[in-house]
Amino acid sequence: MDVLDFIVEGAAQRSISASRGEIASAFVITAETAADVPAREALLDRAMGPKRRKKSSEKLRRGRRPSEGLAFVARDASGAVTGTVRLWDVVLGEGGGSALLLGPLAVDPTIKNAGIGSALMRHAIAEAARLGHAAVLLVGDAPYYERFGFSAEKTGSLAMPGPYERHRLLALELVGGVLAGAQGTLKAAGRKLKAQRLPLAA
């Protein structure tokens, strides 16, 4: 199943769920803006708890901006942020190829069975493919992410820069065979955050 199949399948599933009245709230997915940052951070705190910044994935995100055009939020009818996902540029080991690291993916914990997480995933994968990226990696639960094509099959020789459970390092090839032979520890890449300048003392 290729990326377009994921999108079509996901749209069909959402249509069926909507006809059954299973979707609890309407939402749209848009590009994240600077104004969304406080709401996004508050949502992540609620959904993932205070230890989220200690995860090994955070070492690859710290001090970096998301990959260009790959930061999204879900909004409800009032415009409030109800979900978030971002993707980050990484390098596969020393002198390795480039890829994306997806995460964190989070949905407002008060909203259940609305399809927000799945919609964010499918949108993110489709945009990553459209922008020409070759592979997406993440650390997460295989039973959930397998539905989007992720598996640990191609990550056996790859590692995160910190403690993690190896079986939870998953990958999706957007270009077939691009992860063949990939090995080493993932390294942060992409755009760095600009350091804030402190005002000079009088």
Question: Over which residues does each language-model region extend?
Answer:
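Conserved glycine-rich acetyl-CoA-binding loop
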Residues: 80, 94-95, 108-119, 131, ...
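Short amphipathic alpha-helix that is part of the acyltransferase structural core
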Residues: 3-7, 12-59, 65-81, 95, ...
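Conserved beta-strand in the GNAT
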Residues: 71-73, 80-91, 98-106
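A contiguous, mid-protein "functional segment" used to position or interact
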Residues: 152-184
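Conserved active-site alpha-helix within GNAT-family acetyltransferase domains
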Residues: 130-134, 139-165
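Conserved acetyl-CoA-binding loop-helix of GNAT-fold acetyltransferases
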Residues: 102, 107, 113-126, 138
